[in-house]
Amino acid sequence: MKIKSFLGKSLTLVVLGVFLFSGWKIGMELYENKHNQTILDDAKAVYTKDAATTNVNGEVRDELRDLQKLNKDMVGWLTIIDTEIDYPILQSKDNDYYLHHNYKNEKARAGSIFKDYRNTNEFLDKNTIIYGHNMKDGSMFADLRKYLDKDFLVAHPTFSYESGLTNYEVEIFAVYETTTDFYYIETEFPETTDFEDYLQKVKQQSVYTSNVKVSGKDRIITLSTCDTEKDYEKGRMVIQGKLVTK
Protein backbone atom coordinates (compact mmCIF):
# COMPACT_ATOMS: atom_id res chain seq x y z
CA MET A 1 0.00 0.00 0.00
CA LYS A 2 2.83 2.35 0.89
CA ILE A 3 4.46 1.68 -2.48
CA LYS A 4 1.20 2.38 -4.32
CA SER A 5 0.71 5.55 -2.30
CA PHE A 6 4.26 6.66 -3.07
CA LEU A 7 3.85 5.94 -6.78
CA GLY A 8 0.53 7.77 -6.82
CA LYS A 9 2.02 10.85 -5.18
CA SER A 10 5.03 10.73 -7.51
CA LEU A 11 2.79 10.55 -10.56
CA THR A 12 0.75 13.47 -9.26
CA LEU A 13 3.90 15.53 -8.79
CA VAL A 14 5.10 14.66 -12.30
CA VAL A 15 1.76 15.65 -13.84
CA LEU A 16 1.72 18.86 -11.79
CA GLY A 17 5.28 19.64 -12.88
CA VAL A 18 4.42 19.12 -16.55
CA PHE A 19 1.32 21.30 -16.15
CA LEU A 20 3.26 24.11 -14.48
CA PHE A 21 6.05 23.95 -17.06
CA SER A 22 3.55 24.03 -19.93
CA GLY A 23 1.79 27.00 -18.36
CA TRP A 24 5.10 28.82 -17.89
CA LYS A 25 6.10 28.11 -21.49
CA ILE A 26 2.77 29.39 -22.85
CA GLY A 27 3.00 32.45 -20.63
CA MET A 28 6.51 33.24 -21.85
CA GLU A 29 5.40 32.82 -25.47
CA LEU A 30 2.50 35.23 -24.95
CA TYR A 31 4.81 37.72 -23.23
CA GLU A 32 7.36 37.54 -26.05
CA ASN A 33 4.64 38.02 -28.67
CA LYS A 34 3.31 41.06 -26.81
CA HIS A 35 6.78 42.53 -26.37
CA ASN A 36 7.58 41.97 -30.02
CA GLN A 37 4.38 43.75 -31.08
CA THR A 38 5.13 46.66 -28.73
CA ILE A 39 8.58 47.35 -30.11
CA LEU A 40 7.33 47.01 -33.69
CA ASP A 41 4.60 49.52 -32.87
CA ASP A 42 7.33 51.84 -31.57
CA ALA A 43 9.15 51.60 -34.91
CA LYS A 44 5.90 52.16 -36.79
CA ALA A 45 5.21 55.28 -34.71
CA VAL A 46 8.55 56.71 -35.83
CA TYR A 47 8.04 55.73 -39.45
CA THR A 48 4.51 57.17 -39.66
CA LYS A 49 4.91 60.20 -37.40
CA ASP A 50 4.34 62.49 -40.38
CA ALA A 51 2.02 60.66 -42.74
CA ALA A 52 2.13 63.58 -45.17
CA THR A 53 5.87 63.10 -45.68
CA THR A 54 6.79 61.01 -48.70
CA ASN A 55 10.08 59.74 -49.98
CA VAL A 56 11.51 61.90 -52.75
CA ASN A 57 13.50 59.55 -54.95
CA GLY A 58 17.18 60.13 -54.33
CA GLU A 59 16.63 61.47 -50.79
CA VAL A 60 16.28 59.40 -47.64
CA ARG A 61 13.04 60.23 -45.83
CA ASP A 62 13.59 61.79 -42.40
CA GLU A 63 11.52 59.11 -40.68
CA LEU A 64 13.73 56.40 -42.15
CA ARG A 65 16.81 58.29 -40.98
CA ASP A 66 15.31 58.33 -37.48
CA LEU A 67 14.85 54.56 -37.62
CA GLN A 68 18.45 54.14 -38.72
CA LYS A 69 19.48 56.04 -35.60
CA LEU A 70 17.85 53.23 -33.62
CA ASN A 71 19.64 50.60 -35.69
CA LYS A 72 21.97 51.25 -38.60
CA ASP A 73 20.95 47.88 -40.09
CA MET A 74 17.50 49.20 -41.04
CA VAL A 75 17.39 49.41 -44.83
CA GLY A 76 13.72 49.92 -45.66
CA TRP A 77 10.05 49.35 -44.93
CA LEU A 78 7.66 46.73 -46.33
CA THR A 79 3.86 47.10 -46.40
CA ILE A 80 1.13 44.76 -47.64
CA ILE A 81 -2.36 46.24 -47.24
CA ASP A 82 -4.91 44.23 -45.22
CA THR A 83 -2.23 42.12 -43.55
CA GLU A 84 -0.08 42.41 -40.44
CA ILE A 85 2.91 42.97 -42.73
CA ASP A 86 3.94 46.58 -42.12
CA TYR A 87 7.49 46.24 -40.87
CA PRO A 88 11.01 47.65 -40.97
CA ILE A 89 13.51 45.63 -43.00
CA LEU A 90 16.95 44.91 -41.58
CA GLN A 91 20.12 43.52 -43.09
CA SER A 92 23.12 41.97 -41.37
CA LYS A 93 26.39 40.41 -42.48
CA ASP A 94 24.70 36.99 -42.47
CA ASN A 95 21.24 35.44 -42.69
CA ASP A 96 21.26 34.14 -39.12
CA TYR A 97 21.39 37.14 -36.79
CA TYR A 98 17.96 38.64 -37.50
CA LEU A 99 16.34 35.22 -37.44
CA HIS A 100 16.79 35.47 -33.67
CA HIS A 101 16.99 39.21 -32.86
CA ASN A 102 14.66 42.19 -33.10
CA TYR A 103 15.75 45.61 -34.33
CA LYS A 104 16.77 46.55 -30.78
CA ASN A 105 19.29 43.71 -30.91
CA GLU A 106 17.36 41.80 -28.26
CA LYS A 107 17.04 38.02 -28.51
CA ALA A 108 13.58 37.40 -29.96
CA ARG A 109 11.82 34.22 -31.03
CA ALA A 110 10.01 36.16 -33.78
CA GLY A 111 13.27 37.66 -35.06
CA SER A 112 12.93 40.42 -37.65
CA ILE A 113 12.00 40.80 -41.29
CA PHE A 114 15.37 40.95 -43.03
CA LYS A 115 17.03 41.19 -46.41
CA ASP A 116 19.47 38.56 -47.65
CA TYR A 117 23.01 39.54 -46.70
CA ARG A 118 24.14 39.01 -50.31
CA ASN A 119 21.88 41.75 -51.64
CA THR A 120 22.97 45.34 -52.17
CA ASN A 121 21.23 48.15 -50.31
CA GLU A 122 19.51 49.70 -53.31
CA PHE A 123 18.06 46.84 -55.38
CA LEU A 124 20.91 46.55 -57.85
CA ASP A 125 20.64 42.76 -57.87
CA LYS A 126 18.26 40.89 -60.13
CA ASN A 127 16.60 39.15 -57.18
CA THR A 128 16.30 40.77 -53.75
CA ILE A 129 15.21 38.29 -51.09
CA ILE A 130 13.43 39.14 -47.85
CA TYR A 131 12.87 36.59 -45.09
CA GLY A 132 10.60 36.42 -42.06
CA HIS A 133 9.25 33.87 -39.61
CA ASN A 134 5.78 32.38 -40.01
CA MET A 135 4.55 33.11 -36.47
CA LYS A 136 1.57 31.31 -34.91
CA ASP A 137 0.16 34.61 -33.61
CA GLY A 138 -0.15 35.89 -37.20
CA SER A 139 2.77 38.31 -37.01
CA MET A 140 5.86 38.68 -39.19
CA PHE A 141 5.36 36.79 -42.51
CA ALA A 142 2.45 34.56 -41.42
CA ASP A 143 0.02 36.53 -43.61
CA LEU A 144 1.86 35.60 -46.81
CA ARG A 145 -0.41 32.55 -46.83
CA LYS A 146 -3.34 34.85 -47.58
CA TYR A 147 -2.07 34.92 -51.15
CA LEU A 148 -3.05 31.27 -51.56
CA ASP A 149 -6.59 32.66 -51.76
CA LYS A 150 -6.98 33.90 -55.33
CA ASP A 151 -9.55 36.52 -54.29
CA PHE A 152 -6.96 38.05 -51.97
CA LEU A 153 -4.41 38.21 -54.78
CA VAL A 154 -6.95 39.84 -57.11
CA ALA A 155 -7.71 42.46 -54.45
CA HIS A 156 -4.04 42.95 -53.52
CA PRO A 157 -1.95 42.45 -56.68
CA THR A 158 0.84 44.72 -55.42
CA PHE A 159 2.67 45.65 -52.24
CA SER A 160 4.95 48.53 -51.28
CA TYR A 161 8.63 48.71 -50.41
CA GLU A 162 10.47 51.85 -49.40
CA SER A 163 14.23 51.60 -49.54
CA GLY A 164 16.60 54.24 -48.32
CA LEU A 165 16.28 56.25 -51.50
CA THR A 166 13.34 55.00 -53.56
CA ASN A 167 9.67 54.05 -53.25
CA TYR A 168 8.76 50.86 -55.08
CA GLU A 169 5.52 49.20 -56.03
CA VAL A 170 5.92 45.45 -56.40
CA GLU A 171 3.69 43.69 -58.95
CA ILE A 172 3.17 40.07 -57.90
CA PHE A 173 3.74 37.48 -60.63
CA ALA A 174 4.32 34.24 -58.67
CA VAL A 175 2.80 32.66 -55.55
CA TYR A 176 3.81 29.15 -54.53
CA GLU A 177 4.57 26.64 -51.83
CA THR A 178 7.82 24.76 -52.25
CA THR A 179 10.73 23.27 -50.32
CA THR A 180 14.38 24.18 -49.96
CA ASP A 181 15.09 21.58 -52.64
CA PHE A 182 13.98 24.22 -55.15
CA TYR A 183 16.68 26.91 -55.15
CA TYR A 184 14.69 30.11 -55.59
CA ILE A 185 17.04 32.28 -53.52
CA GLU A 186 19.63 33.04 -56.19
CA THR A 187 20.38 36.77 -56.13
CA GLU A 188 22.47 37.31 -59.26
CA PHE A 189 22.78 35.64 -62.65
CA PRO A 190 25.81 35.53 -64.99
CA GLU A 191 23.76 36.23 -68.12
CA THR A 192 20.34 37.66 -68.91
CA THR A 193 19.35 34.28 -70.34
CA ASP A 194 20.12 32.66 -66.97
CA PHE A 195 17.71 35.04 -65.27
CA GLU A 196 15.09 34.41 -67.94
CA ASP A 197 15.41 30.67 -67.34
CA TYR A 198 14.99 31.28 -63.61
CA LEU A 199 11.86 33.38 -64.18
CA GLN A 200 10.36 30.63 -66.30
CA LYS A 201 10.98 28.08 -63.54
CA VAL A 202 9.36 30.16 -60.79
CA LYS A 203 6.37 30.94 -63.00
CA GLN A 204 5.89 27.20 -63.45
CA GLN A 205 5.90 26.83 -59.66
CA SER A 206 3.18 29.46 -59.21
CA VAL A 207 -0.33 28.37 -58.26
CA TYR A 208 -1.69 31.17 -60.48
CA THR A 209 -1.04 32.32 -64.03
CA SER A 210 -0.08 35.99 -63.90
CA ASN A 211 -0.63 38.76 -66.43
CA VAL A 212 2.36 40.66 -65.06
CA LYS A 213 5.03 40.90 -67.73
CA VAL A 214 8.48 40.26 -66.30
CA SER A 215 11.60 39.84 -68.42
CA GLY A 216 15.33 39.39 -68.08
CA LYS A 217 15.71 43.18 -67.96
CA ASP A 218 13.60 43.52 -64.81
CA ARG A 219 14.46 43.25 -61.14
CA ILE A 220 12.35 41.25 -58.73
CA ILE A 221 11.76 40.88 -55.01
CA THR A 222 11.18 37.55 -53.27
CA LEU A 223 9.34 37.22 -49.93
CA SER A 224 10.07 33.92 -48.19
CA THR A 225 8.81 32.25 -45.01
CA CYS A 226 8.59 28.76 -43.54
CA ASP A 227 5.62 26.59 -44.54
CA THR A 228 5.17 23.68 -42.14
CA GLU A 229 1.97 22.65 -43.91
CA LYS A 230 4.02 21.93 -47.03
CA ASP A 231 6.90 20.25 -45.19
CA TYR A 232 7.65 20.62 -41.48
CA GLU A 233 11.39 21.15 -41.94
CA LYS A 234 11.91 22.20 -45.56
CA GLY A 235 8.60 23.83 -46.55
CA ARG A 236 8.60 27.41 -47.85
CA MET A 237 5.89 29.91 -48.82
CA VAL A 238 7.10 32.28 -51.55
CA ILE A 239 5.73 35.48 -53.09
CA GLN A 240 7.62 37.09 -55.99
CA GLY A 241 7.01 40.39 -57.71
CA LYS A 242 8.49 42.82 -60.21
CA LEU A 243 9.97 46.05 -58.86
CA VAL A 244 8.42 49.19 -60.31
CA THR A 245 9.54 52.66 -59.23
CA LYS A 246 6.62 54.77 -58.03
Swiss-Prot record:
Disruption phenotype: No visible phenotype in growth, no change in cell wall-anchoring of InlA, no effect on bacterial growth within host cells nor on virulence in a mouse infection model. Loss of cell wall-anchoring of Hbp2 (SvpA); Hbp2 is still secreted and runs with an apparent lower molecular weight in gels. A double srtA-srtB deletion mutant has no cell wall-anchored proteins. No cell wall anchoring of Hbp1 or Hbp2 (SvpA). Does not impair iron transport. Decreased binding and uptake of hemin at low (0.5 uM and 5 uM) but not high hemin concentrations (at 50 uM no effect is seen). It is a single-pass membrane protein. It is found in: Cell membrane. Keywords: Cell membrane, Hydrolase, Membrane, Transmembrane, Transmembrane helix. GO terms for molecular function: hydrolase activity. The keyword Zinc does not apply. InterPro entries: Sortase, Sortase_dom-sf, SrtB, SrtB_Firmicute. SUPFAM superfamilies: Sortase. It is an enzyme of class 3 (hydrolase). It comes from the Bacteria. One of its GO terms (biological process) is cellular response to iron ion. NCBIfam families: sortase_srtB. Belongs to the bacterial sortase family. Class B subfamily. This is Sortase B. It comes from Listeria monocytogenes serovar 1/2a (strain ATCC BAA-679 / EGD-e). The gene is srtB.
